[in-house]
Design a protein with these regions (language model features):
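The beta1-alpha1 cofactor-binding region of Rossmann-like NAD(H)/NADP(H)-dependent oxidoreductases
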Residues: 41-42, 63-75, 111
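Amphipathic alpha-helical dimer-interface segment in Rossmann-like NAD(P)H-dependent oxidoreductases
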Residues: 77, 120-138
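Catalytic Tyr-X3-Lys loop
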Residues: 87, 107-126, 141, 145, ...
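Catalytic loop of short-chain dehydrogenase/reductase
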Residues: 95-99, 111, 143-168
Length: 169
């Protein structure tokens, strides 16, 4: 399949494993160079080596925590510099291991856990999107893809993830 991604430059948050890793792999198979982002540097480096060997594309591992504006801004600037620009952002990051902090019956959920889940999934995606838009405007082309999903056993993350599309039109 040709998605017209040859020589495009992408960032995939949550790119060291799971859905993010699978998306990074497919973007690279379509000809994009990809910066994969997650918190764990060792996992990122192993995934980058694996995907680069599979796809013969440039895979750049960048450790960053999307709950930190400073880390997001640094990561996006570094990705743009190493890749030579930015065209695509895939927001697929979530809490470590894809789990949510705030779980269980509502009466047991504490605000700090709920806010942490929102800070990772929703506000983290917003931070990344805000940071990449100037680079996409410079390129004259860009796409932002938000990955969300419903997980009935983790109500906080289920509430946070659907909030993402509300600000994307």
């Amino acid at each position: 399949m040709d998605l017209g991604l040859q020589d495009k430059h992408a960032i995939v948050t949550g790119g060291s494993r799971g859905i993010g890793k699978a998306i990074a792999r497919e973007l690279a198979r379509e000809g994009a160079d990809v910066a994969i982002v997650a918190r764990n540097k060792a996992d990122l480096e192993a995934t980058a080596r694996e995907l680069a060997a599979e796809t013969n594309r440039r895979i750049v591992p960048l450790a960053a925590d999307v709950t930190s504006k400073e880390q997001v801004d640094r990561m996006v600037a570094e990705a743009a510099q190493q890749l030579g620009g930015l065209h695509i952002l895939v927001n697929s990051g979530s809490a470590p291991g894809g789990s949510a902090t705030a779980t269980g019956p509502i009466e047991t959920v504490i605000d700090e856990d709920l806010l942490q889940d929102f800070n990772v999934k929703y506000v983290g995606a917003l931070r990344c999107s805000r940071a990449v838009i100037p680079f996409m405007k410079t390129e004259g082309w860009g796409r932002i893809i938000n990955i969300s999903g419903g997980t009935p056993a983790t109500p906080a993350i289920s509430a946070a993830a659907p909030a993402m599309p509300a600000w994307c039109t």
